Regions:
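Class I S-adenosyl-L-methionine
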Residues: 111-114, 118-126, 136-306
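Short conserved micro-motifs on helix faces and helix-strand junctions that flank
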Residues: 48, 129, 238-241, 338, ...
């Protein structure tokens, strides 16, 4: 660790921030030509449950910063609208609209099906298998009863794919509640990966520690054919001062516009407009109980952030698909009497301005795609850290 900390002190901004400057990265309007990079090598990637491509984007940026090119051998998602956004941003990727269970078996011990055999022949020497299985079944933001959701079984696809492709590294991202699933799906997946020869580590991290301007805890699992990867050591190496809402979106205030869907605020109901006005007239950030709807005045609602106003000088609360509505969380703009725009939510999710959401044609699609996305800074940090360890010979 001391060697890593010395390296951190010597080249701090280059290491911990994308392109050495996270804010410059977020405000970049021109997409890098990842496909034309003059590279010293390439990295092969399979991204299951890829969504709009937050994990892929972070890996491309990490690889590019180290002079490497990424070949996306396979990207799969069941959400066609999210996948259209992915394809628009990563045209060279082999992206497939499909339920992963239509491609992979969920039982790691069953014989390979025809599609798995074909993929095994075409994808070899894989570097990274990554994925964030749908988390609705065990999200900390949902009721306990939803931990029974059948989607939890999709975790096992990650172990199945690891057995088929034999990647050097497997990275799984999800909410912390996944670890407490009553069926032990997370721990069982970790054990399956161990059984097929991987060293497995997992930790819960808060993304504001690595510069994402929101309070967003994630459970990270890394399985490695090489030495055990110390996740906390990587996070410590890339740790930054928490980034605030002001840092992320202040420059977008002048884009409050009716011209583009990304910068178009939602229209609140008359009641919610009154609540927003009350927050600003009284210069407060939490709506008093008597100003809330009757159903939220009772004692069974513990989320005080609902109907709240964001603080300029703090990270935002977790961005979800409900960011357009104040009744879904603390999503009222700190300085303007409205909720967040899609552009602002994307910034808080650490998506740069060059990333196109043009294929999301409706407000609902935008909210779902942005709210469900994985902030690219997470995969940037994890993969950049792993690649540097490889370059130093610490992952063998």
């Amino acid at each position: 660790l001391s060697e890593l900390m010395l390296e951190k002190a010597m080249t701090y901004s280059d290491l911990v921030e994308v392109k050495g400057n996270d804010k410059a990265f977020l405000t970049t309007k021109t997409r890098p030509e990842f496909e034309k990079i003059n590279h010293s090598g390439h990295i092969s990637l399979v991204d299951l449950f890829c969504g709009a491509g937050g994990i892929t984007l972070g890996i491309l940026e990490a690889a590019a910063s180290l002079g490497k090119k990424v070949n996306v051998e396979l990207a799969v998602d069941i959400d066609e609208k999210a996948l259209n956004v992915y394809i628009d941003n990563f045209p060279a990727a082999n992206a497939i609209h499909s339920d992963v269970l239509s491609i992979f078996e969920s039982d790691i011990r069953s014989p390979l099906n025809a599609q798995e055999k074909k993929l095994q022949k075409t994808i070899s020497n894989l570097d990274f298998l990554v994925g964030g299985p749908p988390c609705q079944g065990h999200s900390d933001l949902n009721n306990f009863s939803r931990r029974k959701d059948h989607k939890n079984a999709l975790y096992f696809v990650m172990a199945r794919a690891a057995k088929i492709f034999k990647p050097n590294f497997v990275i799984i991202e999800n909410v912390p509640g996944a670890k407490h699933d009553k069926n032990n799906v997370f721990l069982n997946t970790a054990n399956e990966l161990k059984d097929i020869g991987y060293n497995v580590s997992f930790e819960t991290i808060n993304l504001f520690d690595i510069g994402v301007p929101q309070k967003r805890k994630r459970l990270i699992l890394i399985a490695s054919k090489a030495n055990l990867v110390n996740i906390n050591e990587i996070i410590e190496l890339y740790k930054t001062q928490p980034k605030s809402v002001h840092w992320a979106i202040q420059d977008l205030m002048q884009l409050d516009s009716q011209d583009t869907l990304m910068d178009m605020p939602s229209k609140p109901s008359k009641d919610n407009l009154k609540r927003i006005d009350y927050l600003f007239k009284n210069n407060i950030y939490d709506l008093p109980n008597e100003q809330r709807p009757p159903c939220h005045q009772k004692g069974n609602h513990t989320y005080k952030s609902i109907y709240g106003r964001l603080h300029w000088d703090e990270p935002s609360q977790t961005i979800t698909s409900g960011f357009y509505s104040m009744c879904m969380g603390r999503y009222v703009h700190p300085q303007l009497p409205r909720t967040l725009t899609a552009h602002e939510a994307a910034r808080l999710q650490f998506f740069p301005d060059y990333f196109s959401f043009a294929e999301a044609k409706t407000r609902t699609s935008l909210a779902t795609i942005i709210g469900n996305a994985v902030p690219p800074k997470l995969s940037f940090v994890l993969v950049h850290g792993i690649l540097r360890l490889l370059n130093r010979g610490e992952c063998k």
